[in-house]
Amino acid sequence: MQKRAIYPGTFDPITNGHLDIVTRATQMFDHVILAIAASPGKKPMFTLDERVALAQKATAHLGNVEVVGFSDLMANFARDRQANILIRGLRAVADFEYEMQLAHMNRHLIPQLESVFLIPSKEWSFISSSLVKEVARHQGDVTHFLPDNVHQALMDKLK
């Protein structure tokens, strides 16, 4: 039986920290779905279609990753995709409480849905899409934190 996992998030935009998590997940699971949430309430900088395209290009070298956009409830999306594992990245203790609440709610909705928490590599443990965008808005160099295609797209958005 194939182990299918979902790595959900807004990915606005996808960072090297996200790539670190998804790359490591590909070594643990047969198929990883990078599920990009529409998240209209967060007012993303990039449209859902743009975020999907950026992530597809950034993960093209990973043969067992599928990138899709979604707007459903995560638990229902996982059920529909026949995945029973959710991958979540934990950068700091502050992330844990929220992630634990999500994990419990998802498990309440679908009892067989497991959450697997991965800690990013030290190099990426402090970055977030929001922080990268904020630094870039103030002309800070964020080249190191983003895949090349994403960096170019961010610079184009900020022009």
Curated annotation (Swiss-Prot):
Q: What is this protein called?
A: Phosphopantetheine adenylyltransferase
Q: Spell out the reaction equation it catalyses.
A: (R)-4'-phosphopantetheine + ATP + H(+) = 3'-dephospho-CoA + diphosphate
Names of the cofactor(s): Mg(2+)
Residue(s) at site: Transition state stabilizer: H18
Q: Which organism is it from?
A: Salmonella paratyphi C (strain RKS4594)
Q: Which gene encodes it?
A: coaD
Q: Where in the cell is it found?
A: Cytoplasm
| Record GO biological process | coenzyme A biosynthetic process
Can you quote a single GO CC term? Answer: cytoplasm
Query: Which SUPFAM superfamilies does the annotation name?
Result: Nucleotidylyl transferase
Q: What is its main location?
A: cytoplasm
Q: Its biological function? A: Reversibly transfers an adenylyl group from ATP to 4'-phosphopantetheine, yielding dephospho-CoA (dPCoA) and pyrophosphate.
Q: Give the EC number.
A: 2.7.7.3
| Keywords from the named record | ATP-binding, Coenzyme A biosynthesis, Cytoplasm, Magnesium, Nucleotide-binding, Nucleotidyltransferase, Transferase
Q: Where does substrate bind?
A: T10, K42, M74, R88
Q: Give the first-level EC class, as a single word.
A: transferase
Binding sites annotated in the UniProt record for ATP: T10, F11, H18, G89, L90, R91, E99, W124, S125, F126, I127, S128, S129, S130
Metabolic or biological pathway: Cofactor biosynthesis; coenzyme A biosynthesis; CoA from (R)-pantothenate: step 4/5
The record's subunit annotation is: Homohexamer.
Q: Record keywords: Nucleotidyltransferase included?
A: yes
Q: Name one GO molecular function term.
A: pantetheine-phosphate adenylyltransferase activity
Name the family.
Belongs to the bacterial CoaD family.
* Cross-referenced InterPro entries: Cyt_trans-like, PPAT, Rossmann-like_a/b/a_fold
